[in-house]
Amino acid sequence: MLIHPEEILETIKMVTNEHLDIRTVTMGINLRGCSHPDIKVFNEQVYTRIMRCAEKLVATTEDIQNLYGIPIINKRISVTPIAIVAEACQEEDLSSVAEALDRAAQETGIDFIGGFSALVQKGMTPGDLSLINSIPQALASTKKVCSSVNVATTKAGINMDAVAKMGHIIKQTAELTRDSNGLGCAKLVVFANAPEDNPFMAGAFHGIGEPDCVINVGVSGPGVVNSAVRALQNPALGDISECIKKTAFKITRMGEMVGREVARRLDAQFGVLDLSLAPTPAVGDSVAAILEAMGLESCGTHGTTAALALLNDAVKKGGAMASSSVGGLSGAFIPVSEDQGMIKAVQRGSLSLDKLEAMTCVCSVGLDMIAVPGDTSPATISAIIADEMAIGMINKKTTAVRVITAPGTKVGDMVEFGGLLGSAPVMPVHNFSSETFIARGGKIPAPIQSLTN
């Protein structure tokens, strides 16, 4: 393929001026062979297995970063859902497993490890229940462990008993991490239709259908897309879509090149490239800024959902043309705390929780990194989760909720997390109760569109 000098300079500009980077290289590790009735033996086998697979992950990614000159921001690990592999232990407290995961993460030098997870869309086994009950203590006693719970699928419906329980778990997690503004909640996500090959945290886990060891890559390029859209001269919306497609193609090619080289050097299988546009707190590296570049005065105003749908579709089309290994979440992320444009939109009053929910209908992944008042009830949190799960179930898409109930905060306060997690303005929730609805429990049946056979 003929490459012009202008294209080389364009790529250099993307990296140096427009925040183009590989957001994450995530190694997925199968832990099914580690199961053991004795939890101490199990923990040691989990630690040993992770160390054996991932001991060179950080060094290898840094070598490739230096080779290509492309920043790789995070190195991560995902493991088989712990609720599955720890079931044989028959222990009620699985927080020691999280500590074993954290020890392996610290010693390998990676940034986060995901997979302290349970899949409970149709019901909870004793192992699932033990894991879910252990989440608050697990996240409070570790630094790098991330947790996720899948409570709904299009095929199974919504497990409302699990949804109700997660409201309490999120509140407990916030309370146990009160000293860090409820930071534990930033490492906990509740899913509908969770993908098994997601490289992004906090929802990454190594699915049952995955190979023994795999490399999945997530790219990040909102700043590049924003610059490309703003450079257009009075474009029609079709022209904007075409511009985003071409930009996404270039971003995806770069990500695949890096991912395949990492996998080759580590003798692991290359899994997927996640096309998600993942913002950072850096100025200009914002999904909201792209929507405003299309002509919206402020993200969240009328037309925002349509603009986001255009963006999400164009990214997928451009990325799918560039790679035959697209997977994970693959869309535009709208995490409030990690996006300067979103934060400003909330502060100026154009972006509400209800509008964010509408936006999740057309992008990935859901209500992400939102802060709500510290006195928000568990039932209200569960109701927010239930709404988002319904969107995912009906539309056959992945949706999720990552909500922080920072203790002691009220509407308008800013909650600081630091690093890539940024800071979040505390947003209002509805004052009317959902308590009776959530307390009914049971299951919301799968929709008619689940009957596809």
Swiss-Prot record:
It holds the Pfam family DUF711. InterPro entries: UPF0210. Belongs to the UPF0210 family. Homodimer. This is UPF0210 protein Pcar_2119.
